[in-house]
């Protein structure tokens, strides 16, 4: 099964509809976690290709890992603020197969730890999903809004939820512990689009969690980020 996993909340209802319209024709099934919803929207409830639940707690972005795939499934974890083109699944899956789906995961957003540089310069090279990249690159940290992996390379929710809000970090920590390598894929600029409206930016996890720099997930990040055999 080719499946997509998405977590969302009510202020992004319009984005959710747009994302579902883009992804549903490309996958066998879409799994959605609806934080803070009172009921499942009709366009999801009526679609036989959709399984949607309202969780009993705030799992934030860890909701992308709520559902457990079969080991041989192909899983795309997606975000509601990204514009996915019509060839997103076929093109991404072809690149995963070229690299080798056993022991590897792929995506379009990530960070590579470079190490100490000049004064005032950060030790990271950052690659945003909507910007161009010319080659496959080994990542130190891979974003889960544009992730593709076999089901066997998707961790259980229990591994991600303690760091909900920054799920890229526990995801990559879990990969590192199992020798699974994250890779960033080449693409043209604008092939994927950033669809987050300006009025919703203050509610994004980047603003509400990542910029707070909580010590717990910072420590987890540094436990693996400089130690990958294929990056840095």
Regions found by a protein language model. Give the residues of each.
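Short beta-strand-to-loop acidic/aromatic patch adjacent to the donor-nucleotide binding site
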Residues: 72-83
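Short, well-formed alpha-helical segments that are part of the catalytic scaffolds
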Residues: 6-26, 32-34
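Conserved catalytic core of nucleotide-sugar-dependent glycosyltransferases
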Residues: 83-157
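Short beta-alpha junction loops
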Residues: 34-38, 110-113, 188-189
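Short, charged/polar "capping" segments at the starts of alpha-helices
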Residues: 12-14, 37-43, 115-116
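Residues at the starts of beta-strands that form the adenosine-phosphate
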Residues: 28-29, 74, 181
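C-terminal catalytic/acceptor-binding lobe
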Residues: 1-5, 15, 160-232
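Active-site-proximal specificity loops/subdomain of glycosyltransferases
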Residues: 34-73
